[in-house]
Amino acid sequence: PDMKGVLLAAVLAGGMISAGAQEKLSTNRKTMKTHTSTIRLIYPQWQGGNVAAMVPEVKDPDDVARGYYLGAQLLDFLAPCGGQETLTVPVSTQIGERRVTDGVLDRDVILRQTKAALEMLRASDPGRIVTLGGDCSVSVVPFTYLAAKYGGDVAMVWIDAHPDITLPGDPYPGYHAMAVTACMGHGDAKIVAELPAACD
């Protein structure tokens, strides 16, 4: 059931530019400093999910959690490319001891991967992003990057089986369940401090 949310988040992240921004781009292309290129962002982050908490009968929950990683690879294979630049966020596949830090499972790994994704986007400077991922939290970086790029002239539509509005310290520590609150500038202080903008 969570994969449907991931697929939809990938589609929605690709259409993140608002009507107002599209009009500005089409009528004022020569004077705008923004690029209108579309990139594919392969973001196979799996650490935001805690499969063991969601499906306790799974025999090897850590191995199953990496299914998010495989899902990103499958989406990359199945979704038509269209010739745009493809960036792949480096995501660790190592499973060590999974830790909750300040209320977020695997927070330090997620923070490193967030920084890497942002660095890639800043270097590429895309106007649109098609995100193919991993868990729901892979939408946080693209949404907040585009919110900063278009000065808040971005609307976020989040359709998922779960609202993804939990906070650090809530009973479930998976970051994928905190994706919307992170996009809105709330949540783990270290992660939120790295995000370029908030979606109001």
Predicted feature locations:
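Bacterial N-terminal signal peptides that target proteins for export
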Residues: 1-7
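Hydrophobic h-region of N-terminal signal peptides that target proteins for export
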Residues: 10-19
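Conserved alpha-helical scaffold segments that buttress catalytic/binding sites
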Residues: 25-200
